[in-house]
Amino acid sequence: MSNVIRMPEKSLGEIRKEYIFRNRSVQITAEDGERELYPCIVLYEAVTDIPIHYTRLERYLCHLAKNQLLDGKTLEARAYAVCHFLNYILWETDIRSLHECTMDTIRNFLKSSRRKRDEEEYNKDTWLRYRDYLTDFLVLYHKYNQDTLPFRYTGDELRNAIVLRDEQSHRNIAMVYPASLHLKAPRTTHKKNRILVDGYLDLLLYESKKYEPDITLGIALGAYAGLREGEVVNISFGAIRTIRRGFGIISGLEIDLTDDAPFFKGWTGRIDPGSIKKYRRQRVYPDFIHAVSDLFDEHTASMAARNYPTGKDDPVFVNRQGSPMTVKTYTERVKALFYKRFLPALHSTCEQQGTFAEHAAFIDAYEAEYPGAHMFRHWFTMYLLTKAGLTSGEIMRWRGDSSQESMNDYIHENADMIRLFRETSYTFQEQILVAIGKEVP
């Protein structure tokens, strides 16, 4: 770093504080010819905002193989975390290059980064995520430069590994996760009440079919295939493939998420339309194939009846003006459905069934805080954990996680939610809703 900045009339400490590392998004042409934003870690003169040095450190943000699976926002977040660390080195130490960092340097940075500038602690999940981003970066930087640079830390010091025995496959599974460095994360964890109790989904889908039929298929894809909200709106009609076996019997449904939707390429709108977090081919879980297939047929017929195009490159989900639905519109409509239709119906049916006391805590929690459209993907995970009896590796595949660690972290962090899902249930009875229909606004 000091090799880049040479101004002898000032002390080195003063000089270093006049510069800052920032992420600069640059447009590159991808293999498919599309223009995409890619992070670039650049050293700037702070006052003038003039780029001084293009570091090329963005090469170490993630593995090349993983790079194809990460969207621009994730890469941007990784670059931000690395810039935060580089600025700490630049302003708070006299280290001249990354390989001079010691484990104490890294630990001191993580310790100092627990609090924001206003002294408020970072959210625990945010801090852990950025710690992992930094760890990945430092491990990769060491891996690809250890033969040419005299490092004062090693990649192994930043990682812990344990070997577990999978009782079903009878194979050993290696779990690798960031070292704690004897640092506790901030105590500010605030978990959203994202649990959708077993049976609630049936009621929500019922209400959606009546009042929001245009997003019902999207809800089902989140709950029955684990799609994220941004992935739902990225689906074209050609991306949903029906798999058939003998006599035309449907044996599977596969959603092609290997590329961004054609109708979002070259997007010029003011807001982000939604993105695919992990590019993949995602199958609907076997227990729900026929339910999703029926909803897809109904959705397609409804679109065609209103003269919306249903060609292979056309959007499955459109807004009320007939344009491709953005993730913002989709999530807003899910939220409106949740509060205007689902929650009143849940309240009324529980009273009629005499089960309100059992569900009052969930209803109160929903009224206090919206669980978010991501609740459908959580429901999918809960189902796989409690009803399907799959191993964590199998659940990881169905969820579309990029690593085993992500799945294991999810199980550990949501242990209470998993227990509640196992122990609580709601029986959806359509006839009760019909009988009290006038009471549900």
Where is each model-derived feature located?
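N-terminal core-binding DNA-recognition domain of tyrosine recombinases/integrases
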Residues: 57-168
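Short, charged phosphate-coordinating catalytic segments
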Residues: 144-149, 220-252, 393
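Basic, Lys/Arg- and aromatic-enriched nucleic-acid-binding interface segment
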Residues: 198-229
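Conserved tyrosine-mediated DNA breakage-rejoining catalytic core shared by Y-recombinases
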Residues: 235-295, 305-312
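Major-groove DNA-contacting interfaces characterized by cationic-aromatic clusters
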Residues: 278-337, 343-355
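Short, basic (Lys/Arg/His-rich) helix/loop patches that form interaction surfaces
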Residues: 331-394
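Catalytic-site neighborhood detector that most strongly recognizes the C-terminal catalytic loop/helix
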Residues: 399-424
